[in-house]
Amino acid sequence: ILRCLVGSEMCIRDRAMTIYRQYAIGPSSFFLRAESFFTLATQAREYSRGYGDMSRLHEMSHGEGFLEILLSHTGKGLYLMDEPESALSTQRQLTLLEHMYRMANDGSQFIIATHSPILLGLPDAEILSFDENGVHPCDYEDTDSYQITRVFINHRESLLRHLLGNEM
C-alpha cells in the first residue's frame, strides 16, 4: 500500500528521483515541500485552485497550515511526499499517519521519503532502505529511525552522557 523511502545518499537519491516518463498532472496537483509552504499558501489564496478553503493559511502556524493542505486532499491518487514530518510536531505526524492510512485503504498510494519513526510505522507499509548496500526492503524495527529513537527513549541518560560527556 505504501512505500517509504529512507536514506540520504545523494547519488542514490538523485537516481531515485530521475523522471523517466512524464504523466498528465491533474488540476489540483502541486509539489509541496515544507520549505516552500509560504509560497504555496500565497498561490492557493490568490488563485483558489480547488484547495478548499485555504484563505487562512497565512494565519496558521507553519505546521498547522502544512497539515491543512495535506488533509484537504482526500481523493484517490498517487501522493509523493518528501520528508513531510519536517513541518509537523510529533502529535501532528500521528494525525497525518491516520489520514494516510484511511486514504490508502480507500485506494490511494503514497511514496514517502521520511526519517520519521512515526510515519515509517504505518501499518502494511513497504519500507525500502537506501544505503551503501543499494535499495532493499527493510522491516520497521530494522530502520535507523526506529532503532535510534528506541535507544534514546530507553537509555536517554546513558546516551546523553556518551554524547555530551562532562558537559552534562
Predicted regions, residues:
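C-terminal lobe/lid and adjacent interdomain/linker elements of RecA-like ASCE P-loop ATPase modules
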Residues: 91-112, 116-168
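Single conserved hydrophobic/aromatic residue that forms the stacking wall/gate
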Residues: 1-7, 11-12
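Conserved ABC ATPase signature
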Residues: 29-95
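Loop/turn-to-beta-strand initiation segments
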Residues: 28, 75-78, 104-111
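Catalytic phosphate/metal-binding cores of nucleic-acid and nucleotide-processing enzymes, i.e., regions
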Residues: 15-25, 52-54, 90, 95-104
